[in-house]
Amino acid sequence: MTASHRPLALITGASQGIGAAVARQLAPRYDLILGGRDEDRLAAVADELTGAGPGAVRTLAVELTDDEALAGALAGIERLDALVHSAGTGELGTVEETSAAVWRRQFDVNVVAVAEATRLLLPALRAAGSDGGADIVLVNSGAGITAKPGWGSYAASKFALRAFGDALRAEEAAHGIRVTSVHPGRVDTAMQRAVVAHEGGEYDGSRFLRPESVAAAVLAALTASRDAHLTELMVRPQG
């Protein structure tokens, strides 16, 4: 990559939490497209990062589950060096408690939207893959490794995301694209607050990973030398 052509990264879920932390980690190295639903929050992150590094930052406000809107939003991207899927949703409940609507919503956001965005961006990723390499990082979950009681629909969507990554990795290796699944344990985010409230516990963010720690794992996958492929990363809170 020449000095006149900085690599470009697109991050979904970039308006808060892990996605925003990833954006901060990548800003010194990449031009950024910040994806998310909340235009005001995206603009706030973009304003924070603009001027903090040498790269360009722009926002892409779109509902990932709206296929037509998503296709339109991504249509102009001709080359993409890194795609980080950080957007996701989580709703807990036993199988008995969980309606079909909840199952569909979690799979739509956590799996189908990821697959569709990736499919639309494959030509741009392959363009970079054939010219130095490209990366796709799926911010998954510990629930994509182990399913616990009350986590059935969420864990099932994350197991499916892991399977998607495994298939994609094998399919795109010949195009110079690496695919990494990052499986964090509990992270100090708004989603984690909702989880703890659902469990009836008292929230103590110091017990959990910081979003910046997960973002560091994402950066490690992206910056690994091209002879190395970090296929899966497990990140757990200390203690």
Ranges and model annotations:
Residues T94-V95, S99-F107:
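Substrate-binding pocket helix/loop in short-chain dehydrogenase/reductase
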Residues S15-Q16:
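Conserved glycine-rich cofactor-binding loop
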Residues I177, S181, G201-G239:
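C-terminal helical subdomain
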Residues T118, S157:
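Active-site helix of classical SDR
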Residues R29-V45:
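Conserved glycine-rich Rossmann-like NAD(P)H-binding loop of the short-chain dehydrogenase/reductase
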